[in-house]
Swiss-Prot record:
Signal sequence residues: 1-25
Entry's Gene Ontology cellular component terms: extracellular region
Expressing tissues: Expressed by the venom gland.
Domain of life, per lineage: Eukaryota
Additional remark text: Not detected in the venom.
Main location: secreted
Protein's name in the database: U-myrmeciitoxin(01)-Mg4b
Length: 64
């Protein structure tokens, strides 16, 4: 029971951060990131109106 709840919680956290990043990206005018898993895709950073990519750390390795 606890493992199922933890798994659902992790999905909710990852999904919410994905939505927040999408909203912030559209506000600052960054292009949409590719639909890869949230922990493995590029994070959009705008510098001088040029999008830059930074890999996010793998969250699954820390939780596993």
């Amino acid at each position: 029971m606890g493992k199922i709840f933890f798994f659902v919680l992790m999905i909710a956290i990852i999904g919410s951060t994905f939505l927040i990043e999408e909203a912030l990206g559209s506000l600052v005018g960054c292009p949409r990131p590719n639909f890869l898993p949230s922990w493995n895709r590029c994070k959009c950073i705008c510098k001088n109106n040029k999008p830059m990519c930074r890999k996010l750390p793998n969250l699954l390795k820390t939780t596993a």
